[in-house]
Design a protein with these regions (language model features):
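Pocket-lining segment of extracytoplasmic ligand-binding domains
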Residues: 68, 74-163
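Conserved C-terminal helix/tail region of periplasmic/extracytoplasmic solute-binding proteins
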Residues: 198-233
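Amphipathic, soluble alpha/beta structural segments
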Residues: 4-6, 150, 170-174, 222-233
Length: 233
C-alpha cells in the first residue's frame, strides 16, 4: 500500500456557485470527475449519497486529466469537481473544498475508515510464481515510503525530476504537503481498510456481486512486512 487514502478532493466552483451553502445546492448542477468507476468517482458518489442526492439529481461529466478538469471548472462547464490535486485552484481561490480525502480525517469522515488507493498489485498466479520479484518491488516501494516520512522540501527538489514540477516548484511542494499524511509509512494494509473498501463498494454499486469476496485473500502484508523489518520502516 502506497497511500492510505484516495487523495481526492471535492471542490465547489467559486465562479458558478459563489453563494454555496450546502450539498443540497448541487441538485441540478454539473459535477466533473476524472473517469467513471475511478476512485474520484467513488468519492463523489459517496459524498452525494451521504447528502441524500440521487444520481438523477445531478449531471456527472468525465473530464480525464487534471488540465482538462481545471479548464472545465474555470470556464464554467462544471459547477463542482471531484479530482486529484486541486492545489493550484485552492491557492487562487477558485474552489472551495468541502470533502478532502487527502487527509486521514477527511477519509474517515466520508467512508468510516481508511480507504487505500495506490498500491502494488498482481495476479495471484504471478505472485506465486515470482515471489522474489514481488519482494524486490515491494522492498523498493517500502524503502521509498520510509524516505518520504522525513524528506524535506530540499530533498524533494534534489530528487524529483525537474519536469515533474511543470515550471512551479512551490506549487508541487504545496501539493505534496497536502497529501503527505496519506502516504503509508510502511506499505502495510491498514487494519479494517479492506472491509471499508468492500462496504463502500457494496453501498455505492449495489449491482456488483461482491457478497462472496474473501477479503483475507484479496491482499497480503507478507512482502511489505519483510521489507518493513529490513528497512526498519
Amino acid at each position: 500500500v502506497q497511500t492510505r487514502t484516495p487523495q481526492v478532493a471535492f471542490g465547489i466552483s467559486m465562479r458558478t456557485l459563489p453563494g454555496f451553502k450546502g450539498l443540497a445546492d448541487l441538485r441540478g448542477r454539473r459535477i466533473g470527475l476524472a473517469q467513471a468507476g475511478s476512485v474520484d468517482a467513488m468519492v463523489t458518489l459517496q459524498l452525494l449519497a451521504q447528502a441524500g442526492i440521487r444520481l438523477e439529481d445531478v449531471s456527472l461529466m468525465e473530464l480525464g486529466t487534471s488540465p482538462s478538469a481545471v479548464t472545465a471548472l474555470r470556464s464554467g462547464v462544471v459547477d463542482a469537481l471531484g479530482h486529484f490535486d486541486p492545489a493550484m485552484m485552492e491557492q487562487r481561490g477558485e474552489v472551495r473544498i468541502i470533502a478532502d480525502t487527502r487527509t486521514l480525517k477527511g477519509t474517515i469522515d466520508l467512508f468510516g475508515g481508511l480507504l487505500p488507493s495506490a498500491c502494488l498489485y498482481a495476479p495471484i498466479d504471478f505472485v506465486q510464481k515470482h515471489p522474489a520479484t514481488c519482494q524486490a518491488l515491494t522492498a523498493g516501494i517500502v524503502h521509498a515510503l520510509k524516505w518520504l516520512q522525513t524528506a524535506g522540501p530540499g530533498d524533494l527538489i534534489k530528487t524529483v525530476p525537474e519536469h515533474f514540477f511543470q515550471g512551479d516548484r512551490a506549487l508541487y511542494l504545496a501539493s505534496f504537503m497536502k497529501v503527505r499524511e496519506s502516504i503509508s509509512p510502511d506499505g502495510l494494509m491498514p487494519a479494517d481498510a479492506a472491509q471499508t473498501a468492500l462496504r463502500s463498494l457494496l453501498g455505492l454499486y449495489p449491482g456488483m456481486r461482491l457478497e462472496g469476496v474473501a477479503l483475507g485473500r484479496s491482499f497480503t502484508n507478507e512482502f511489505a512486512r519483510r521489507a518493513k523489518d529490513r528497512f526498519k520502516a
